[in-house]
Structures are given as C-alpha cells and as structure tokens.
C-alpha cells in the first residue's frame, strides 16, 4: 500500500549505519533523544534560563560571542527567518523600484553578450566546446532584485502571543511546501535568498546567478 518513489541518495552509507543504530537502540532512549532535541531546537525562544544556557554554550563556548543581541535584533531576525519574502516585498517597495530592476537586467544582459563574444574569440577552445559553452550561456538565468513570483504564506497561521507555536507551524508549512514539489517540474523562478539579504550566489545545478536587491544598494554597489 506504499507507493515507491525513486530518490537520489547522496550518501547511502549513512542510511545503512542509521538503520543499524535504529534497530539496536531501545525505544525509551529514542524518546529521550527526541525530547532533548525538541527542547534544544526551541531553547532560544523559551524562558530566560533556557535562553541564557543556549547562548552560553552555542554562542559563547563554541563561537566566542560574549553578548547576546538586543531584543529588537532578535525580533527582526526571527521575522526574517520565517517571513523573509513578506519583509522582502516591503524592502523592495521602499528601496528597489521596478526601474532599478530593469536597469540591472539590462546590465547583466550586456555582460552575457560580452561572454558570448569572448567565447567565440577563444583560440584554445575547440569549435565543439565553444558550441557547448554557448548553449550553456543561452540557458543561463540571471535573477535580479526580487522574485517575479512571491511565496504564498496564506496557509501559515501566525499568532502574536505564540512565538514557539509560530515556529512549529512554520516548520510544518515549510515541510508541506517542500513535499508538494515531489514529482513536479522544477520551479526555476523560485529564490533561495531574500531580497533584503546582502549577498549573492551562483547555482551551478540550475545555471543561475542571483543578485538580491540589498547587494545592489550603496555602499555595496
């Protein structure tokens, strides 16, 4: 009664070892293990004692951080981690208008054209390799500023008086969002970085480069 699905397992030996540990470990030990990790995962959000213990070990002992971030910074980071694209819509509305995106897209298009000319003029590259390089360049996807399609958070319930519950519901929503993609075509319009992130990345698997709006603002650009 279980449907079989082919998946890619990057490290099969992990599951072989895990199966052995799973079978050899008694149920009470697994229960205690899961209880600990559940509390540990949310310790930074619970009472003051647990917040301090969590910080003392993970931040001070392991990373040498001496002081906790102020409450406002924790609040912003928490909201950003859960509702990143909602905040991103606000950010680009105030800081990155459509004309700024169009200007950057034109700049990147010109860079891609330049790459095409450079490939054609490479003396050491064979005609076959040039053809393959041009085909890859033709399929290259630049993503500028912000997504053309924003994430839909309408099924995620957020309560102002339930911080831990918000995180749990976000985990459930995120899991449902991921599993809904199984067996579906890859959504190449999806972003894996928010517009307000000061960073950029190249994804070789998808042959795409991503420049969030924040990295295209002074003093970075």
Feature names for model-found ranges:
Residues 121, 144-152:
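Amphipathic alpha-helical coiled-coil segments
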Residues 1-106, 110:
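Noncatalytic, helix-rich "gating/capping" subdomain that lines the substrate-entry/channel surface
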Residues 104-119, 133-144:
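Short amphipathic alpha-helical coiled-coil/interface segments
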Residues 161-221:
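Active-site-adjacent "gating/activation" loops or surface patches in catalytic cores
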């Amino acid at each position: 009664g279980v449907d079989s699905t082919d998946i890619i397992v990057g490290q099969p030996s992990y599951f072989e070892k895990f199966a052995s540990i799973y079978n050899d470990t008694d149920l009470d030990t697994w229960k205690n293990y899961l209880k600990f990790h559940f509390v540990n995962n949310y310790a930074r959000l619970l009472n003051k004692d647990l917040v301090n213990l969590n910080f003392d070990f993970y931040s001070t002992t392991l990373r040498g951080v001496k002081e906790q971030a102020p409450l406002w910074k924790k609040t912003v980071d928490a909201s950003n981690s859960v509702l990143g694209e909602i905040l991103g819509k606000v950010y680009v509305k105030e800081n990155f208008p459509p004309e700024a995106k169009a200007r950057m897209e034109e700049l990147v298009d010109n860079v891609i054209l330049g790459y095409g000319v450079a490939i054609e003029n490479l003396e050491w590259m064979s005609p076959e390799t040039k053809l393959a390089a041009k085909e890859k360049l033709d399929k290259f996807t630049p993503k500028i500023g912000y997504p053309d399609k924003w994430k839909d958070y309408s099924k995620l319930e957020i309560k102002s008086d339930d911080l831990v519950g918000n995180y749990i519901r976000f985990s459930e929503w995120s899991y449902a969002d991921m599993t809904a993609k199984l067996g579906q075509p890859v959504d190449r319009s999806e972003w894996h970085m928010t517009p307000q992130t000061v960073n950029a990345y190249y994804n070789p698997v998808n042959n795409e480069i991503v420049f969030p709006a924040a990295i295209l603002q002074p003093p970075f650009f």
